[in-house]
Amino acid sequence: MVPMRSDAPLKIIVIRRDNIGDLVCTLPMVTALRARYPDAEISALVNSYNLDVLKGNPELDHVYAYTKAKHRPPGKSVAGVYWDRLRLFARLRRERFDYAIIAGAHFLPRALRLARMIKPKHIIGFTEPKPGAHHIDVGVPYTLPQPMHEVEDIFRLLAPLGIEGTPPAATVVADAKEVVEARALLAKQDWPAGRRLIALHISARKVSQRWPVERFVALARRLHQESGAAFLLFWSPGDSSNPLHPGDDDKAREIVTGLGGIPILAYPTHRLGELIAGLSLCEAVVCSDGGAMHIAAGLGKPILCFFGNSDRKRWHPWGVPHVLLQKESREVTDISVDEAAEGFARLLEKTKGG
């Protein structure tokens, strides 16, 4: 265990620069840090694309975000992006952090570069026999003696700070204003009170994770017939022909049309905060492996998830009841409607009395 300062609360910054699911899987680390060091000043450094995952998080004192050039808003130059980044890191250096934690599996040179720009007293991270690893002065040699979840893997970085054991659940907090707007949309539907509200998230980045539209329609019909359920439909907005950011507008329209007479609200989410708020109102979630699945887990939602060519041991929903369906082919298209319906029934059994 590394020595701790005794004259003032610790100042710790957790760095995670990659995808939405990765960031959600870092949140148990933040919760454990707060439990072990309740008086510490705990911050996070993320990219602007993922920022909403951390908004309102009660365990964090400060959240800092930098913009990647590919995520810059319209009218913002690349030079402007880098100038803003330089100013941000000048500010972070003035904070004089005790520890910067590079939250990610393996030795991560790019994240290490960010940590060094902050100039903390100590850098905690995984090390491997690679150039630059010597800059991590509180190193944890990276080995993977057995398969483990992403949450468990990176949680090992807290051992130098005296934190070990089973990681807690992730905590994602929906923005109160976004939730009010989502509730207002639902209120306009004039659905009978007491219906089970189920989220259907139909988009997936990997082709092997995409469940066919007609099966979402058939599954929703069956779940409605069995319990009178209503649905919120989520997808990645946009045209499927867009080469840079293909979306699933066409699929969403097909599903809404196919479910004529069944209560379903199409809920396009152009911002991450909208997705978080919408999912927060649902009783359960049906989706493929991906960022939305991890957000749902962070919101504490029971999940029926479809896994294609993904490592279920590494990426299953963390800390919530779930049923994971994966075929030997590692193709989601091989999962039948019957299997999905049976999986959802098992999910409800898991949540009874919980």
For each feature predicted by the language model, list its residue ranges.
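Catalytic machinery of carbohydrate-active enzymes
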Residues: 1-354
